[in-house]
Amino acid sequence: MSGLWFTEDHEWIRIEDDEGAVVGITDYAQDQLGELVFVELPEVGAELGQGDEGAVIESVKAAGELKIPVSGTVTEVNDALADEPGQVNADPLGDGWFFRVRVRDTSELEGLMDEEAYQSYIESLD
């Protein structure tokens, strides 16, 4: 189940190896939010369940949260976002990642969308 997966709330998770994954928000989400001005990340070691709040996001337009797409333990956070939250706007699928997790249950990925399904989903929103 490697690859890039998406939620209907516009979060993404990229599975990197057997247990490790990176989490962030999509280009669609950052575009809807506008310029990000603040990101609060979880603590390394935090145990999060699927759908739990993983991060707090504030932009010039709104405040919201990133919900974790699958259950897991936070293993690393992108500390650069504290000083440069705009990295999320500039590169949401790259340097704008939020945190890494050790995935607890890969079967939870089955409820997520692949890139093609997500693209169709966001096209249906416009």
Role assignments for model-derived ranges:
Residues 1-3, 66, 70:
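Short, glycine/small-residue-enriched coil/turn segments at secondary-structure junctions
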Residues 1-50, 86, 90-126:
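Acidic, low-complexity mobile loops and tails
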Residues 13-15, 60, 71, 77-80, ...:
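Residue-level recognition of beta-strand microenvironments
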Residues 30-31, 44, 71-74, 79-82:
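Short, charged/polar surface micro-motifs in flexible loops or helix N-caps
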Residues 32-38, 60, 68-71:
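Short, solvent-exposed beta-edge and connector elements
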Residues 58-67, 84-86:
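Short, Lys/Arg- and Gly-enriched loop/turn segments at beta-strand edges
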